[in-house]
C-alpha cells in the first residue's frame, strides 16, 4: 500500500506504466530488497525475457531505466551488474517508492527521518509566511480530514500524508518541493512501523493542530 500511496502523493499513479517501466520496477524492487546483491550479475536478456514473458527489446528498455537511476551498469562482454548503493539515485521517486515495498533498513529510515526533521520545521514556517489563503485552507482541510479518519489506520495514513504535502506546497519553495519525496518516504516508512493501532491516531492530532 505504501508504494502506491507514494505514487498517489506524487500525482503519478494515474499514468499507466508501460511494459519497460513495469520491468524496471520489478527488477528495481528486487535490487532494493537485496535479492540482487551489490556487484552481482543480473540474468541476461534472454533469461529475463523468458521470465517476464516480454521481448528482449522491452528488457533492454527496462534495464536502461535502471541504469539511468544508478542501480545497474552494463558492460560489453561482462554483462549487467548491480551497482553499489552509493551510486544509486536515492532521491529518485521510483527508488524511494521501491524502498516502501520492502522492509526498510533501520539506518535508511533513520537517515530519512533526519532529513524530515531538518526540512519540515522550515517548511511550516515558510508556509505560514508565504502560503496563500487557499493553501492555508488546504492545510486546515487536511487536518480536519485526519480527525475524521482517525478510526482507520489506512485512511488516517492518507490524511496525514496529505496534511504534510499541503504544508510543503504552501511553503512555495521550488527547491524544497523538489525534495518532497524524501518527506513522503520518511512519513510513510515511519507510519508503517509505529502506527499499527487506530487508537494511536488520536494522540497525534493535537500536535498537528499546533501547526495551524
Outline where the language-model segments fall:
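Membrane-interface catalytic loops of GT-C/OST-like multi-pass glycosylation enzymes that act
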Residues: 197
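Short linear motifs at protein or domain termini
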Residues: 1-119, 125
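Conserved amphipathic alpha-helical segments that form helical-bundle/coiled-coil interaction surfaces
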Residues: 112-193, 202-210
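Short helix-capping and inter-helix turn/linker motifs at the boundaries of alpha-helical repeat units
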Residues: 18, 201-202
